[in-house]
């Protein structure tokens, strides 16, 4: 069975927040090849919050920190403030150690630097999906 499929046979559902359409499509292709189901794309933080409100049972969110309108950092805390934090993997060019440490300490599952590499995406996302989200 592919890593993107739960033991009950249901694909794990993913939301992608990415300011580059090309990168979002690339990320979706990588995840879908492993059985994940991408259920939505957001090009800015406000769109992601709206999508999250519509899909509260999403299994995982990939979050770029360099989003327009509402950046990924603010978006993370907006979603966290809604209750149970879903699994969130940061996929970003942002690499300030203090920022990343804070997000991990606050419940983000992992960080993947850009440019994205298929092996690294699958390694980190597959590991995150096995973890229980932090409350």
Curated annotation (Swiss-Prot):
PTM-bearing positions, type 4-aspartylphosphate: 64
Pfam family, one: Response_reg
Residues annotated as domain Response regulatory: 13-129
GO biological process, one term: phosphorelay signal transduction system
Signal peptide boundaries: none
Annotated SUPFAM superfamilies: CheY-like
InterPro entries per record: CheY-like_superfamily (IPR011006), Sig_transdc_resp-reg_receiver (IPR001789), ST_Response_Regulator (IPR052048)
Name recorded for this polypeptide: Uncharacterized protein LIC_11769
UniProt-listed SMART domains: REC
Keyword Glycosyltransferase: no
Keywords tagged on the record: Phosphoprotein
Domain of life of the native organism: Bacteria
Record-linked Gene3D superfamilies: 3.40.50.2300
Entry keyword annotation includes Phosphoprotein: yes
Residues spanning the membrane: none
């Amino acid at each position: 069975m592919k890593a993107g499929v739960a033991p009950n046979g249901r694909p794990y559902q993913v939301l992608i927040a990415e300011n580059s359409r090309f990168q979002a499509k690339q990320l979706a292709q990588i995840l879908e090849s492993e059985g994940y189901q991408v259920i939505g794309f957001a090009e800015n933080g406000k769109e992601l919050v709206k999508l999250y409100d519509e899909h509260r049972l999403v299994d995982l969110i990939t979050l770029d920190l360099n989003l327009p309108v509402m950046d990924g950092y603010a978006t993370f805390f907006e979603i966290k403030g809604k209750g149970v934090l879903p699994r969130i993997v940061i996929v970003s060019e942002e690499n300030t150690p203090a920022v990343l440490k804070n997000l991990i300490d606050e419940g983000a599952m992992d960080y993947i630097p850009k440019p994205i590499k298929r092996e690294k995406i699958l390694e980190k996302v597959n590991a995150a999906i096995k973890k229980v989200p932090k409350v």
